[in-house]
Regions:
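Short alpha-helix capping/helix-loop boundary micro-motifs
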Residues: 14-15, 54, 58-62
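Short, conserved catalytic or interaction motifs in soluble domains
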Residues: 34, 59-62, 79-82
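Short, acidic/hydrophobic/Gly-rich beta-strand patch recurrent on exposed beta strands
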Residues: 11-14, 41-46, 105
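Surface-exposed strand-loop junctions at beta-sheet edges and helix termini
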Residues: 24, 62-63, 67-68
Length: 125
């Protein structure tokens, strides 16, 4: 369940403030913007019938129909006071705080899939 107690078919991972969220593979942007109670969302289609949904972003990048190469920036996580001074200070960049929540959902032909079958997650030390 998420912070509101809603059970969703994806997973929630903790990220650092201001973390970049990138496309794991080349994909077409299907949507980038606000989506009901998911906040700012980026929906990518790496192949026909497959959707990667990234939600909980502070800012999204890309336009619907845009084809993104692998590792392209699709979003930016939020933080307490997002501004260029905080973003670039060594203290902020090296704080290691995992205070943001990124929701990841995978769908195949509109059926939820287990994200762990699609992504490799490494715990940062």
């Amino acid at each position: 369940a998420d912070a509101a107690g809603i059970v969703r078919p994806g997973i929630i991972i903790r990220t650092k403030e201001y973390a970049f969220v990138t496309s794991p593979v080349a994909a077409t942007v299907r949507y980038a913007g606000p989506l009901s109670d998911y906040g700012m969302v980026s929906i990518l289609e790496p192949s026909e019938g497959i959707l990667f949904i990234f939600a909980g972003l502070n800012k999204v990048f890309g336009e619907p129909g845009q084809i993104l190469p692998e590792a392209s920036l699709v979003g930016l996580m939020g933080g307490e006071n997002i501004n260029i001074e905080n973003f670039t200070t060594e203290k902020e960049l090296n704080s290691g705080r995992l205070s943001q929540s990124l929701y990841i959902e995978v769908r195949r032909n509109d059926e939820p899939q287990n994200p762990f079958d699609w992504f490799e997650f490494n715990k940062e030390e």
